[in-house]
Amino acid sequence: MRLERNLTNRKCVCQYHLSFNIQPSMSLTIGDPAPDFSAPNQQGDTVQLSDFRGKKVVIYFYPKDDTPGCTAQACNLRDNYSELQQAGYEVIGISGDGVKSHDKFANKYELPFTLVADEDKSINEAYGVWKEKSMYGRTYMGTARTTFVLDEEGTITDIIEKVKTKDHTAQILK
């Protein structure tokens, strides 16, 4: 990070020049094997995707714990969790938040599924969801809300990029 200062009329104007050195990930498509990962869940226990072999899995990437859209999405999955389980799915939520944040979020909303802490964004990058975003004229790197549906062999069977947070279960079970 480089900091430049321009002093004008006794006002300090600071400009930050940030550069992100992120390797572009391959774009995953339906039929691809889901990248394996190993990271802590909300209890601090290590979760590895390969441990779910033999089960269908929903992996949903979301930007931030306890924010309106992310909470709506998590609560929709919570409210329909038994329906997802009856269809044979395990659910894993992944964001860049830490273990403590995930634990607080899961407890506050009584989320019955696993939340994985991807603080270094390596899982986001492997799945191609760590992207440049724009808000209010400002660009930044962040998680693109995306869901991957996997079969029992760990193969991607669906990718949902236009997530309807309040009706997400219906998108998954379509």
Task: Go through each PLM region and give its residues.
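Basic polycationic patches enriched in arginine
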Residues: 2-5, 10
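Serine/threonine-rich, low-complexity intrinsically disordered segments
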Residues: 10, 23-24
